[in-house]
């Protein structure tokens, strides 16, 4: 079957930059879906996305759809005809369903069968529908109309190129008749560009000052920005999302170095970086110590004969932005940070839970309570908690919401607060996402944990639990944040105690009955997914969860120990034995004695197991107390042989009641040893 290259390019007004790459990928995916359904093959694919165009190039696309045959079985022959050979309703209905006369149905087999040979269509006749369907299925939240057209798209369309080989595919899509004329750069090449063949597409546009390939533009911007930064003895801040957005804004990228007055460096650099990145799409430069340089890189969409004009234009545009940040910073510093709490008394956190100031007071008390348990200062944690929300009422955060916490840090330093108190005002929001940075100070960790626990307890306390994908207060993220801080920072905090303290802070604002247990269950349930992501089996998690440890750090240490235990050759047998023991003890009548009486032993294997348990108990108790869970389980693994021998030779449910009760007591001692670490019966 012969094949030819295929090109489709839809020209538009400037497409949304943040969505450009995803629109291109979706366009290609839709075309691939249509071609697959039509049974058409090709050797390679490429998507192109630039500010004013979406394009797909397929190499060696089949020019003819393959013929195909369909066979549809109908009712059995005996059900299709009556005794006289007349067709029944089943036969007539089958023929009608197939859209043919009964005489066209094959009646020679055990079942009626309709067979049809369908000749393949020319690919050129199928492509318009495939392309149109793909465009209609693009992930566009809001489509628009333009002019007198009734068509809808993300932006008004301007032209359409559709070529199969060197021939134009005759069609009209989104009010544009297909042709071979594309368009070049608005300024460098305002004339139309004739695309002779699909294979020449990229180079034809390159000659017209358009780099159609998104990845090529992105790499060029990244490389040239790094080179210019080195020339300025600095390094560029190039967030991937910003790089993608800038790439989507330009067809012919030309990075240029600009500057601003050094006086602006007195403003917190995070504010300057935020406004330059978010509002102007600039790449900021840092020196070797991570300090902001008074220079930045802009990416022009034109190769100017006088780049100085572009540089000066950008410098002129950014100056008011930086001046605003400077003004807000100076205004905020005119009053102590703590004074902003007065404004927060009128800002509602949650209607049933009070104001943001109320929350700050609760966080202050809870942080002061938590700090000593993790080795921190109660006084500093309490102070940081009280100041934790102050910057939310500042001019700086009002203009730049991303500065919450960061602004508080600078204002606290300006007021002479201790370094760890100032740092905690920013660290309270950590981690800001999965895998993000954790607090570095104990004061910051205490405030971060307190803030998250306060939110969890408060929102759970008024019954606003997260459901499905709805989690408006980010409670799942808060719970994971608490766990990450405690586990990864190796902080041994009893969450049961902390949550109960948090509940008391709310008084009658929440329904306290069962609230602590509900919040703790929610928090520790988050560990299940965390461990699954780490490749730890859910049974390992459940074996520890059954003991309900209050410390996340202790929980993790037990899980890691059980995971290591499961790799031992004795693990499976001991897990099965523990499961058997658990079942037996669960069926025991009456209370099980605490003491084992050797005088009731009548089998040597009972004595052997008892002796092994006694020795293991003496060795394991200190290990468990010191949380040396790996060592404890490794020592308990030695019980496999006496346990196996016991169950092979001893009938637990002996006829003699005292012997039976004593054997239950012996097994209870055995189970208790393992329960000092985890319920390994759940591993079986």
UniProtKB/Swiss-Prot annotation:
Main location: cytoplasm
Enzyme class: ligase
GO biological process: arginyl-tRNA aminoacylation; glycyl-tRNA aminoacylation
Alphabetized UniProt keyword annotations: Aminoacyl-tRNA synthetase, ATP-binding, Cytoplasm, Ligase, Nucleotide-binding, Protein biosynthesis
Record GO cellular component, one term: cytosol
KW tRNA processing (keyword) present: no
E.C. numbers: 6.1.1.14
Top-level taxon: Bacteria
Keyword Repeat attributed: no
InterPro entries with a match to the protein in the record: DALR_anticod-bd, Gly-tRNA-synth_bsu, Gly-tRNA-synth_heterodimer
Pfam family, one: tRNA_synt_2f
MF annotations from Gene Ontology: arginine-tRNA ligase activity; ATP binding; glycine-tRNA ligase activity
Compartments (UniProt record): Cytoplasm
Family: Belongs to the class-II aminoacyl-tRNA synthetase family.
Name this protein carries in UniProt: Glycine--tRNA ligase beta subunit
């Amino acid at each position: 079957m012969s094949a030819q290259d295929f090109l489709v390019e839809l020209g538009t007004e400037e497409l949304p930059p943040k969505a450009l790459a995803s629109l291109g990928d979706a366009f290609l995916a839709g075309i691939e879906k249509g071609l697959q359904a039509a049974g058409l093959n090709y050797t390679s694919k490429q998507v192109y996305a630039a500010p004013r165009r979406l394009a797909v190039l397929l190499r060696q696309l089949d020019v003819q759809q393959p013929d195909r045959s369909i066979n549809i079985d109908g009712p059995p022959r005996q059900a299709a005809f009556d005794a006289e050979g007349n067709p029944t309703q089943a036969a007539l209905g089958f023929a009608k369903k197939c859209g043919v006369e009964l005489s066209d149905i094959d009646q020679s087999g055990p079942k009626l069968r309709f067979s049809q040979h369908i000749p393949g269509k020319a690919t050129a006749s199928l492509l318009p529908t495939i392309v149109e369907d793909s465009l209609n299925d693009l992930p566009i939240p809001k489509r628009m109309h333009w002019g007198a057209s009734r068509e809808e798209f993300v932006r008004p369309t301007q032209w359409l190129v559709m070529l199969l080989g060197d021939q134009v595919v005759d069609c009209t899509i989104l009010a544009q008749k297909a042709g071979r004329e594309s368009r070049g750069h608005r300024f460098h090449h305002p004339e139309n560009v004739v695309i002779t063949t699909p294979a020449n597409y990229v180079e034809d546009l390159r000659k017209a000052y358009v780099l159609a390939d998104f990845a090529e533009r992105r790499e060029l911007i990244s490389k040239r920005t790094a080179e210019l930064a080195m020339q300025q003895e600095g390094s560029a801040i190039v967030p991937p999302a910003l790089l993608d957005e800038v790439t989507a804004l330009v067809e012919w990228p030309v990075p240029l170095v600009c500057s601003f007055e050094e006086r602006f460096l007195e403003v917190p650099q995070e504010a300057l970086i935020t406004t330059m990145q978010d509002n102007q799409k600039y790449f900021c430069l840092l020196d070797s110590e991570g300090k902001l340089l008074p220079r930045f890189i802009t990416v022009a969409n034109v190769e100017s004969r006088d780049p100085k004009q572009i540089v000066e234009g950008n410098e002129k545009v950014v100056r008011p932005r930086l001046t605003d940040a400077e003004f807000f910073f100076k205004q905020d510093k005119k009053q102590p940070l703590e004074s902003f709490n007065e404004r927060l008394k009128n800002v509602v956190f949650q209607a049933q839970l009070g104001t943001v100031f109320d929350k700050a007071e609760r966080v202050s008390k809870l942080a002061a309570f938590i700090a000593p348990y993790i080795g921190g200062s109660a006084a500093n944690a309490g102070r940081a908690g009280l100041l934790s929300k102050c910057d939310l009422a500042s001019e700086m955060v009002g203009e730049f919401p991303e500065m919450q916490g960061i602004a508080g840090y600078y204002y606290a330093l300006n007021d002479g607060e201790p370094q760890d108190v100032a740092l905690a005002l920013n660290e309270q929001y950590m981690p800001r996402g999965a895998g993000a940075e954790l607090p570095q100070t104990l004061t910051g960790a205490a405030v971060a944990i307190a803030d998250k626990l306060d939110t969890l307890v408060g929102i759970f306390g008024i019954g606003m639990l997260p459901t499905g994908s709805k989690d408006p207060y980010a409670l799942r993220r808060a719970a994971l944040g608490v766990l990450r801080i405690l586990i990864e920072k190796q902080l041994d905090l009893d969450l049961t105690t902390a949550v109960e303290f948090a509940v008391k802070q709310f008084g009658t604002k929440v329904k306290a009955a069962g609230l602590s247990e509900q919040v703790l269950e929610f928090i520790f349930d988050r560990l299940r997914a965390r461990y699954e992501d780490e490749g730890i089996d859910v049974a390992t998690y459940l074996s520890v969860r059954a003991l309900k440890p209050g410390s996340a750090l202790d929980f993790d240490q037990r899980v890691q120990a059980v995971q290591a235990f499961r790799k031992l050759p004795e693990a499976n047998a001991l897990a099965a034995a523990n499961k058997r023991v658990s079942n037996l003890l669960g069926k025991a009548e009456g209370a099980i004695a605490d003491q084992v009486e050797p005088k009731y032993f009548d089998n040597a294997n009972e004595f052997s197991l008892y002796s092994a348990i006694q020795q293991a108990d003496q060795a394991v108790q200190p290990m468990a107390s010191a949380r040396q869970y790996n060592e404890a389980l490794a020592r308990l693994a030695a019980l496999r042989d006496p346990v196996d021998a016991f169950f092979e030779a001893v009938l637990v449910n002996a006829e003699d009641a005292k012997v039976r009760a004593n054997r239950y007591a012996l097994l209870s001692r055995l189970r208790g040893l393992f329960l000092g670490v985890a319920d390994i019966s759940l591993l079986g």
